[in-house]
Amino acid sequence: MSHGRSVADADRDVRQYLVRITAHLGEVLGDNLAGLYVHGSLASGAFHRERSDIDLIAVTAAKLSAPMRESVAHALVRLSDARPTAGDIEVSIIQERYARAFEHPMPYDVHYSTAWHEPIRRRQFDFTIDRTNADLAANIVDVRERGVTLYGPPPSTMKS
């Protein structure tokens, strides 16, 4: 069994893909993008391109409107379709205030994973509903402790 990889020693196409994700989210979110962080296996050195997903947390300065949520979700669908790995991307977009001061379950503006791909692509998803996720608090702790910054301040600054 091969050893896992981290962002630093990931294959070139994976690193380039992270650059593309960062650029696309920056284009869609503009000045509202406060930070973008890798967590999970790719941050910890346990990433295997043939099976691991790419876990990301995007932090925004302000809440996203429903049309912006939809635009971001569709951008994530397109990015997923262009991924260089077998595992998909898993992205949660949360407001900075929640990244700094936990609320449980944690509110989020957008979540993308394989399970959400088709409902988003087929426009069968209601972006006007505010949602929460009980797992996001653990993901934020993971980002704070082992996260890799793609954009924004170091993840350790995500504390109140």
Where are these regions (language model features)?
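Catalytic metal-binding acidic patch
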Residues: 40, 44-74, 88-95
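Helical scaffold of the NTase/Pol beta-like nucleotidyltransferase catalytic core
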Residues: 1-37, 68
